[in-house]
Amino acid sequence: MKIYNFHGKKNIVGPRIREARSRQQLSQADLAAKMQLEGVVIEQNCISRLEIGTRFVPDYELPIYAKVLHVSVEWLLGMTNE
């Protein structure tokens, strides 16, 4: 499978995930633990790579990030400001 870059990044949601995580005062390890409780196997280092854009984000993870961070998928994708 070929993974493409968009403006040098492997995802567009990383900054929004970092913003939502920081607003809730969650560490990267806390977010990884919440994702694991929802059935996504992910570690703190993967969250770090995701936030800086060096990790591809599978589509099935987006609704789970939205759920645990209490935001919409549209917001994560930068389609809305709220």
Name these PLM-found stretches.
Residues 1-24:
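A short, Lys/Arg-rich alpha-helix, primarily the initiator
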Residues 17, 28, 44, 59-62:
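Helix-turn-helix DNA-binding elements, focusing on the entry/boundary residues of the two helices
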Residues 25-49:
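Short alpha-helical DNA-recognition segment
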Residues 35, 51, 61, 80:
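DNA major-groove recognition helix of helix-turn-helix
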Residues 54, 58-75:
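DNA major-groove recognition helix of helix-turn-helix/homeodomain DNA-binding modules
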